[in-house]
C-alpha cells in the first residue's frame, strides 16, 4: 500500500524548489512537462512523460522509495488539450471529462493499492480558488470537479506558499484551503518547504524509519 501525497501551490510558491535537499540518487522524478528544475542539481533517475500508463509502469519499476510527479496537474491538462477538439459537443464532452477523471482517479488508486508500502508518491499540483473562495488543486473546471474530489483521495495535502518572503509548507488548514495531515505528523502548522523533511516525517510517523531522536538516544 503506497502513500500518495498532494502538494498544491501557486506558480513560484516553491513546489519544485522543495526537492532541492534530496540527494541526486535519492529521488525518482517524473517530469510531466519536462521543464528544468529551479536549482543546480540533476536527479539521476528522471523520466519525462504525460502518459498515464507510462507513469504507472515507472512507479512500479523504480526501486526508489520517494517519487515526485511534477506537475501532476498537467496529466489532466494535457489529456484535455490533446483530445477536446475531437470530442465534439454534448455527450462527447461529458465522455471526455469522465475519461479524464477516471484516469487520474485510477492513477491515485494504483499508488494506494498496487505499490509497496515504502513508496511515497508526491503529486505536485497548482492551486485554484473555487466559487466559495476555498483553495483547492487546480483541474480543468467544474465538470471534472463534480466527478471526482481529488484532494479527498489523499490523507496528506500540503500547501506550498510564501510567508513574509519565505517559502513554507502549510501542514494544517486555514479553514479556507484543503490542507490536511494526520494528527501529530508534523510539529508545526508551517515548516520550511523542504520535501526531504516532509518525507522523513511521514516515514517516521508510519514507522518506516526510526525517529532521529530515538536513534540518537540509543547511541548514548
Segments and roles (model prediction):
Residues 24, 33-37, 73-74, 127-131, ...:
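Conserved nucleotide-binding/hydrolysis micro-motifs of P-loop NTPases
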Residues 42-46, 117, 153-154:
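A short helix-to-beta-strand connector/capping loop
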Residues 1-69, 73-78:
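Conserved P-loop
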Residues 71-149:
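P-loop NTPase motor core
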Residues 130-220:
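Conserved GTP-binding G-domain of TRAFAC-class P-loop NTPases and closely related GTPase folds
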Residues 27-29, 121, 157-159:
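Short, well-ordered beta-strand core segments
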Residues 65, 119-120, 151, 155:
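Conserved acidic residues
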Amino acid at each position: 500500500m503506497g502513500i500518495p501525497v498532494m502538494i498544491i501551490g501557486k506558480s513560484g510558491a516553491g513546489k519544485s524548489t522543495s526537492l532541492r535537499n534530496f540527494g541526486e540518487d535519492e529521488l525518482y522524478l517524473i517530469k510531466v512537462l519536462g521543464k528544468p528544475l529551479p536549482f543546480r542539481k540533476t536527479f539521476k533517475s528522471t523520466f519525462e512523460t504525460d502518459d498515464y500508463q507510462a507513469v504507472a509502469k515507472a512507479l512500479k519499476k523504480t526501486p526508489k522509495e520517494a517519487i515526485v510527479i511534477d506537475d501532476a496537474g498537467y496529466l489532466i491538462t494535457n489529456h484535455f488539450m490533446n483530445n477536446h477538439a475531437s470530442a465534439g459537443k454534448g455527450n462527447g464532452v461529458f465522455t471526455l471529462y469522465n475519461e479524464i477523471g477516471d484516469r487520474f482517479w485510477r492513477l491515485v488508486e494504483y499508488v494506494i493499492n498496487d505499490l509497496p508500502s515504502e513508496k511515497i508518491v508526491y503529486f505536485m499540483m497548482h492551486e485554484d480558488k473555487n466559487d466559495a473562495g476555498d483553495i483547492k488543486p487546480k483541474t480543468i473546471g467544474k465538470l471534472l470537479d463534480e466527478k471526482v474530489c481529488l484532494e479527498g483521495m489523499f490523507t496528506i495535502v500540503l500547501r506550498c506558499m510564501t510567508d513574509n518572503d519565505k517559502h513554507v509548507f502549510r501542514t494544517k488548514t486555514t479553514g479556507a484551503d484543503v490542507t490536511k495531515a494526520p494528527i501529530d505528523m508534523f510539529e508545526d502548522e508551517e515548516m520550511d518547504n523542504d520535501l526531504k523533511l516532509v518525507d522523513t516525517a511521514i516515514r517516521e510517523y508510519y514507522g518506516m524509519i526510526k525517529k532521529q531522536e530515538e536513534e540518537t538516544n540509543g547511541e548514548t
